[in-house]
From Swiss-Prot:
NCBIfam families: dephospho-CoA kinase. Keywords: ATP-binding, Coenzyme A biosynthesis, Cytoplasm, Kinase, Nucleotide-binding, Transferase. ATP binds at residues 11-16. GO terms for molecular function: ATP binding; dephospho-CoA kinase activity. Pathway: Cofactor biosynthesis; coenzyme A biosynthesis; CoA from (R)-pantothenate: step 5/5. Gene3D superfamilies: P-loop containing nucleotide triphosphate hydrolases (3.40.50.300). Belongs to the CoaE family. The gene is coaE. It is found in: Cytoplasm. GO terms for cellular component: cytoplasm. It comes from Bartonella henselae (strain ATCC 49882 / DSM 28221 / CCUG 30454 / Houston 1). The lineage of its organism: Bacteria, Pseudomonadati, Pseudomonadota, Alphaproteobacteria, Hyphomicrobiales. It is an enzyme of class 2 (transferase). This is Dephospho-CoA kinase. InterPro entries: Depp_CoAkinase (IPR001977), P-loop_NTPase (IPR027417).
């Protein structure tokens, strides 16, 4: 089984590309979705509540409040990552084990910080989703709860698009229309299944 590591900076179109892989019948593990689910389950909730008092509303993590804390405190960001990353990797391992048992030939790990965390060691091919900066920023700024400060913080934590592209086995440019993006995804699938 071949494992694709799908990555790219904020608002580059990773979710759209991941959906195109799914539509083509390829199983996708989303690190962001795993984190989102962890924010709703025990024991993660108790750990977050203990380490980050004041980020809970109605028994749930208020992601906006948590984000505001993390933007201003790198130590707290590292604390959260120490809680979340091992749990996400555990879910990723289960996903891969299940895919192998089911005889899948190709799977995708959608991991925003794949290269920053040296995750490329766990995959066979790295696919970087990329778009021009103006398009990236435009996409980011229409997101709910996004601000210039938050965009700069997130983008600053991530490896530059140029460096990511240099480390890619495949680059999917999402700066054009959706059909063009879909065709690029199908090309990647065909190329990897052929070898």
């Amino acid at each position: 089984m071949k494992i694709i590591g799908l990555t790219g900076s904020i608002a580059m179109g990773k979710s759209t590309v991941a959906d195109f892989f799914r539509q083509a019948g390829i199983s996708v593990f989303s690190a962001d979705e795993a984190v989102y689910k962890l924010y709703k389950s025990e024991p993660t909730l108790s750990l977050i509540e203990y380490k980050f008092p004041g980020v809970f509303e109605n028994g749930k993590v208020n992601r906006q409040k948590l984000s505001e804390i993390l933007i201003n405190d790198n130590e707290k960001l590292q604390t959260l990552e120490k809680i979340i990353h091992p749990l996400v990797q555990e879910k990723e391992k289960k996903f891969i084990d299940t895919a192998r048992q089911q005889g899948e030939k190709l799977v995708v790990l959608d991991i925003p910080l794949l290269l920053e965390t040296k995750g490329e060691k766990r995959v066979d091919s790295v696919v970087v989703v990329s778009a021009p900066l103006a398009i990236q920023k435009e996409r980011a700024m229409i997101r709910q709860n996004m601000s210039e400060k938050k965009f700069a913080f997130i983008n600053g934590r991530q490896m530059s698009d140029e460096k990511k592209r240099a480390r890619a086995d495949f680059i999917i440019d999402t700066g054009k229309d959706l059909e063009n993006t879909r065709e690029q995804v199908l090309f990647v699938i065909k190329s990897l299944l052929k070898n």
